[in-house]
């Protein structure tokens, strides 16, 4: 019985690649130094899988930045602005495409399906010339072979590559990207020929777009592509790998009818209906099924007994020698190795498996199917599963009851938004076009040092409070000097907008090295939600009250919303996600009510990640949006009309969920908008009625560039063309945490000046 891993984390157990990349980008190390770190990482990963007994070990899943960018490099699809003149693509061109350089901007980055990983979006058009320009896939196959490891080279499939691309600047938005199929397939044929010549016997094409809602034209492209590649692929075993959702019946039909394909990989964790499809529609005889039964997107130990039952039912359909045990997707979406978690509670640790442990699980399942079951390993796993099911740390009956009572009720504030805004204005007395910021202010080296030393118990609580108090006082003073209307305390006490709350809620655990790649060298360390969530004590009230006592202007209380906490964590898999979300919402509700009782009149509940959690298939959108929006409303349904509830959302694509945003019933919403002005404003231009306050970001905080007063005023005027004067707010598009004060002060000065300039113009026009 064979085993397979779809892909593996690239960063290394201690983020070795991250530090090597950043050192190279900063000019502190050479290309050779970077390549040495990468070579060592690849070798250790291949050795680890070979030692674990994995039969089908992937190669070319390593990347210096992103696998879609690697594919663009392989195809020589370099946008003109990078002045590439041909030949093998080196680091200079590659990293310019990923990150931009002094003279040209980077390519766009967007989320990889519904994960928290981001890929570089290829820019294509009718004049894009393709040529074989990066031999990475072949080189890495040969590299592994020289180490005595025969691997399965992995390529992003040609159809998914095109479907994930976008028309380049200046190309019609309606340009048919799939029309380029005949132009890219010759390059794929060259790569395949080289891999065959190097001795490859298997090849894996990742075609995850097969799980999306595809039309007949798009499905026909799959048939056309793999029919065209048929002769090039002859003599090779070909695996088409899909992941992240159920495969629709039509896509399954298309996929299983491809002659050139030997094997199909399915995600059986997020794709439970695919199991039914295999059973009802049948499976082509003589073909391999790579069954993704070990979750590549979470950190929970697999329930081996349950997986074995699933595999045995599949074995009866596809045959013993044609079933391969696999992961549901690449393991790059989970943490690297549990061995590095020396401080994690031992009971919780027994419930977990990171990438290295999942490799062992896959092999244990394959051996069990082959009649070589490791009884001790399975018994330990069963004991851990039982402990997790019965542990009193997981279940809090009071929380369970409170969350169950939420179902079926609506949780809306009693008064409509226009009446609430009137009541709030009487109390807050804000000018037209009120100014505010999103929450965080720059986090200096000194500030990070204070937090680090307090955590390590190197400074006392008194010293810590004194240092944070001083920082808040500085931030309040700056905002008053700038004449901002609604202030923030700057969040100097917070390391991360999710971790800060998770550390104070029950049901959360934290890792020391549970890093997951987000994009390029950037990694995130998601908290683990292992049990019922509750709030033992107030979390932010002390700091918010302190900040409000320093000013007569309104001070915003700052909270992270339940959907964002959920979407940016590793979530328990023993109950539906919405139940966990409702529990978090109830905890945040208590905090909102305590802030209000403490005299905080404006409370912001960030839902930066609400859009991110949207399922891949349209049929599932309504259910998700219903519970996500309901969770937000739960947090603030009990406040008075005079308390103003703000929310903040990130990323651009709101047009398809605008009605859900309105349904959140916030008093004011601020939106990250500066990179996609027209996209957002077009919604309102098309007649969507929005009655609450709204603050589309007037400048991009992700850039060090300082916008002029005129530029911001021009942007505000464009907004006023489609939005009422009395609902528009003026604010940056995101928090200022990553910027420096010498960038923040002039940018905010110009922002306030622009608001005042337009107020004057509006007053004189009356």
Swiss-Prot record:
The active site is at residue 702. Its cofactor is Zn(2+). Pathway: Amino-acid biosynthesis; L-methionine biosynthesis via de novo pathway; L-methionine from L-homocysteine (MetE route): step 1/1. Its EC number is 2.1.1.14. It is an enzyme of class 2 (transferase). One of its GO terms (biological process) is methylation. Zn(2+) 2 binds at residue 659. Its main location: cytoplasm. Keywords: Amino-acid biosynthesis, Cytoplasm, Metal-binding, Methionine biosynthesis, Methyltransferase, Transferase, Zinc. GO terms for cellular component: cytosol. L-methionine binds at residues 438-440, 491, 606. The keyword Methyltransferase applies. It catalyses: 5-methyltetrahydropteroyltri-L-glutamate + L-homocysteine = tetrahydropteroyltri-L-glutamate + L-methionine. It is found in: Cytoplasm, Cytosol. 5-methyltetrahydropteroyltri-L-glutamate binds at residues 18, 116, 496, 519, 522-523, 568. Binds 2 Zn(2+) ions per subunit. Zn(2+) 1 binds at residues 648, 650, 672, 734. InterPro entries: Cbl-indep_Met_Synth_N, Cobalamin-indep_Met_synthase, Met_Synth_C/arc, UROD/MetE-like_sf. GO terms for molecular function: 5-methyltetrahydropteroyltriglutamate-homocysteine S-methyltransferase activity; zinc ion binding. L-homocysteine binds at residues 438-440, 491, 606. Belongs to the vitamin-B12 independent methionine synthase family. Catalyzes the transfer of a methyl group from 5-methyltetrahydrofolate to homocysteine resulting in methionine formation. This is 5-methyltetrahydropteroyltriglutamate--homocysteine methyltransferase 1.
């Amino acid at each position: 019985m064979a085993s397979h891993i779809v892909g593996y984390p690239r960063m290394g157990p201690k983020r070795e690649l991250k530090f090597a990349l950043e050192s190279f980008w900063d000019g502190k190390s050479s290309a050779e130094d970077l390549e040495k770190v990468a070579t060592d990482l690849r070798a250790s990963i291949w050795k680890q899988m070979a030692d674990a007994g994995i039969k089908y070990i992937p190669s070319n899943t390593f990347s210096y930045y992103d696998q879609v960018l690697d594919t663009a490099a392989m195809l020589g699809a370099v946008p003109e602005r990078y002045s590439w003149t041909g030949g093998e693509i080196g680091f200079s061109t590659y990293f310019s495409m990923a990150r931009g350089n002094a003279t040209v901007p980077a390519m766009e980055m967007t989320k990889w399906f519904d994960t928290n990983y981001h890929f570089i979006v290829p820019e294509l058009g009718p004049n894009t010339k393709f040529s074989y320009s990066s031999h990475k896939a072949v080189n890495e196959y040969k590299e592994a072979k020289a180490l005595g490891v025969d691997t399965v080279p992995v390529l992003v499939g040609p159809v998914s590559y095109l479907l994930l691309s976008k028309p380049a600047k200046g190309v019609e938005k309606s340009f048919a990207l799939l029309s380029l199929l005949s132009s890219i397939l010759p390059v794929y044929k060259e790569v395949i020929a080289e891999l065959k010549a190097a001795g490859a016997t298997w090849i894996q094409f990742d075609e995850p777009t097969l799980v999306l809602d595809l039309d007949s034209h798009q499905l026909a492209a799959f048939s056309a592509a793999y029919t065209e590649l048929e002769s090039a692929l002859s003599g090779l075993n070909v695996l088409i790998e899909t992941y992240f959702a159920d495969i629709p019946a039509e896509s399954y039909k298309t996929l299983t009818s491809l002659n050139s394909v030997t094997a199909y990989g399915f995600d059986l964790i997020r794709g439970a209906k695919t199991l039914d499809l295999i059973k009802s529609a049948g499976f082509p005889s003589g073909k391999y099924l790579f069954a993704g039964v070990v979750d590549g997107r979470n950190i929970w130990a697999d329930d081996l007994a349950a997986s074995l039952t699933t595999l045995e039912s599949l074995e009866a359909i596809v045959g013993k020698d044609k079933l391969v045990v696999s992961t549901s997707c690449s393991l790059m979406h989970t943490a690297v190795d549990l061995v590095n978690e020396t401080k994690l509670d031992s009971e919780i640790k027994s419930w977990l498996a990171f990438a290295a442990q999942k490799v062992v699980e896959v092999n244990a399942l394959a051996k069990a199917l082959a009649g070589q079951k490791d009884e001790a390993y399975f018994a330990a796993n069963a004991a851990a599963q039982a402990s997790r099911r019965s542990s009193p740390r997981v279940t809090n009956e009071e929380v369970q009851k409170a969350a169950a009572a939420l179902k079926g009720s609506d949780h809306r504030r009693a008064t409509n938004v226009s009446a609430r805004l009137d009541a709030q204005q009487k109390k807050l007395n804000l000018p037209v076009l009120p100014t505010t910021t999103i929450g965080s202010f720059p986090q200096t080296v000194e500030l990070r040092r204070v937090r680090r030393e307090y955590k390590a118990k190197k400074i006392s609580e008194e010293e810590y409070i004194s240092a944070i108090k001083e920082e808040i006082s500085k931030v309040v003073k700056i905002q008053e000097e700038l004449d901002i209307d609604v202030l923030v305390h700057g969040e100097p006490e917070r390391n991360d907008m999710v971790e800060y709350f998770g550390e104070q809620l029950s049901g959360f655990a934290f890792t020391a090295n549970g890093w997951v790649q987000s994009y390029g060298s950037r990694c995130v360390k998601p908290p683990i939600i292992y049990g019922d969530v509750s709030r033992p004590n107030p979390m932010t009230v002390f700091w918010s009250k302190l900040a409000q006592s320093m000013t007569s202007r309104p001070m915003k209380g700052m909270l992270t919303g339940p959907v964002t906490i959920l979407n940016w964590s590793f979530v328990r898999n023993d109950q539906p996600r919405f139940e966990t979300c409702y529990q978090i919402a109830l905890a945040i509700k208590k905090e909102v009510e305590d802030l209000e009782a403490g005299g905080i009149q404006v409370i912001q509940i960030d839902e930066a990640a609400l859009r991110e959690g949207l399922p891949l298939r349209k049929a599932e959108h309504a259910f998700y949006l219903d519970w996500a929006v309901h969770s937000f409303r739960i947090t603030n349904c009990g406040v008075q009309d005079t308390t103003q509830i703000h929310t903040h959302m990130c990323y651009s694509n709101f047009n398809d969920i605008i009605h859900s945003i309105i349904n959140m019933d916030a008093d004011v919403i601020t939106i990250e908008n500066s990179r996609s002005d027209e996209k957002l404003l077009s919604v309102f231009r098309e007649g969507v009625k929005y009655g609450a306050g709204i603050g589309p970001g007037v400048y991009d905080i992700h850039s060090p560039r300082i916008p002029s007063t005129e530029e911001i005023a021009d942007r505000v005027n464009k907004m006023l063309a489609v939005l009422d004067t009395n609902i528009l707010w003026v604010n940056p598009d995101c928090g200022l945490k990553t910027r420096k004060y010498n960038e923040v002060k002039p940018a905010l000065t110009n922002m306030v000046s622009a608001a005042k300039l337009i107020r004057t113009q509006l007053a004189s026009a009356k």
